[in-house]
Amino acid sequence: MKSVILLFAVIAIIVAVIIPAINGESSSNPSANAGIMESLKQLSAKAEELIKKLLAKKAK
């Protein structure tokens, strides 16, 4: 159950950080969106790894 709560916390943090950045920079700097999307992919990959580790610990 804790891993589910942690997952939602990670998603909420990502949304809180990424969405304003996209809204703020999309009009002035289109190339910034590519960088933001790349960092979002990296963040989601890290979050996925963390969740897999937590589930593996829970299974033991």
Swiss-Prot record:
Residues 1-24 form the signal peptide. One of its GO terms (cellular component) is extracellular region. Expressed by the venom gland. One of its GO terms (molecular function) is toxin activity. The keyword Signal applies. Keywords: Antimicrobial, Secreted, Signal, Toxin. Residues 25-34 form a propeptide. One of its GO terms (biological process) is venom-mediated paralysis in another organism. It is found in: Secreted. The keyword Protease does not apply. It comes from the Eukaryota. Belongs to the formicidae venom precursor-01 superfamily. Induces paralysis 5 minutes after injection into blowflies (L.caesar), and then death within 24 hours. May have antimicrobial properties, like most ant linear peptides. This is U20-myrmicitoxin-Mri1a. The lineage of its organism: Eukaryota, Metazoa, Ecdysozoa, Arthropoda, Hexapoda.
